[in-house]
A protein has these predicted regions:
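Contiguous alpha-helical scaffold segments within structured protein domains
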Residues: 3-79, 151
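Hydrophobic aliphatic residue packing
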Residues: 1-2, 127
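Glycine-rich, small/acidic residue-mixed loop/short-helix segments
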Residues: 67-73, 77-152
Length: 152
């Protein structure tokens, strides 16, 4: 929903400002389709000449979309609540070149192969007002889109 998307966008922009990055550009919200699911996407770009990409990544990740807010309190809560290894779920992935250019995304669904078995992982954001049944349906759609990539 747009409210959730705006919450994450505002979090990212506030953290850019915290790092004294003021010359950012925020694009328009667009709908991106992935298999049988659509996501709201907003490109945020900035010139970060003197900041190591990994410092920036550490400050921005994890965002409220995959962790909660405030970040430290949410991380502690998730650690106490979850009894499984998230693996690479919700991890940033991307590249950095020798000139310091970088491009990172967040893996909102993933798969890994362990001991000859494939394991899929996907999640959903629960916020005040979320309807759990709809969130479960969303997770099922995400998992189906992964399975379709592998098995179709």
């Amino acid at each position: 929903c747009i409210r959730d998307s705006n919450f994450v966008i505002n979090y990212l922009i506030e953290n850019l400002k915290f790092l004294n990055i003021r010359n950012y550009k925020k694009g328009e919200i667009k709908i991106k389709k992935f298999g049988n699911i659509a996501h709201l996407c907003t490109l945020i770009s900035a010139e970060v000449n003197k900041i190591c990409p990994f410092v920036l990544l550490e400050k921005l990740h994890p965002s409220p979309a995959v962790c909660g807010f405030p970040k430290e309190k949410a991380l502690d809560y998730l650690d106490s609540l979850e009894n499984f290894d998230r693996g690479n779920y919700a991890s940033p992935f991307g590249w950095v070149d020798v000139e310091g250019n970088a491009d990172f995304r967040v893996a909102l669904r993933g798969a890994r192969i362990l001991n000859g078995e494939i394991e899929f992982i996907a999640g959903s954001g629960l916020v005040k007002g979320s309807i759990c049944e709809k969130e479960i349906d969303e997770i099922k759609l995400k998992l189906a889109s992964l399975a379709n990539l592998i098995f179709d």
